[in-house]
Amino acid sequence: VVYYYCNGNLYARRRPYRKMLVRSKNQQLWQNRFSACISFYRSLNGVCLKPIWEKLGKLMSVNGLNAFIASNIQAFNGEMGISNYEEIHFSKGVLKVPMGFEIRERKGNKLKVCWDTGWQTSLDAGTDRLCVGVIYDDEPLRPLLAENVTGIRSEGMGMIELREGITKCYHLYCYFMSRDGR
């Protein structure tokens, strides 16, 4: 028996034992989904999104990894890839993302995005800056933050610059971050 403290409470559990091999296809599928989700989370290390998940985890009384997995595991498939890009959450927060996000103009690797500012104008969130996560189809488990992104929530528009030579499909994840990084 192993005794340990977590959040000020004393717990006991069995001593770890050697893991059994996965037997069913369904178990293998979920094990692969879990591995892909963890790989994706680890790649967020250099993208400065881990602190967002760590803060959310503290609110949920879990660690950041568990908060990320609970929010994103459904997006991954059993082949160590992403099956549903719409289910990916780069970040989570209490403020809603504005309605009517759309790409209005594309010139080379630069995109102009616009959104409806209607209900946010009276909120303190009007000074939040636009952030954009990018997943390229040729590297689905390596998310990046778009560099050279401009846009403030209250302005209703922003510019995004993607990496040069984009020929394949990519997925954009727009969210807003306060000036102090929350």
Predicted regions, residues:
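Long, polar/Ser/Thr-enriched low-complexity segments
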Residues: 1-99
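Charged linear interaction tracts used for macromolecular binding and regulation
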Residues: 57-182
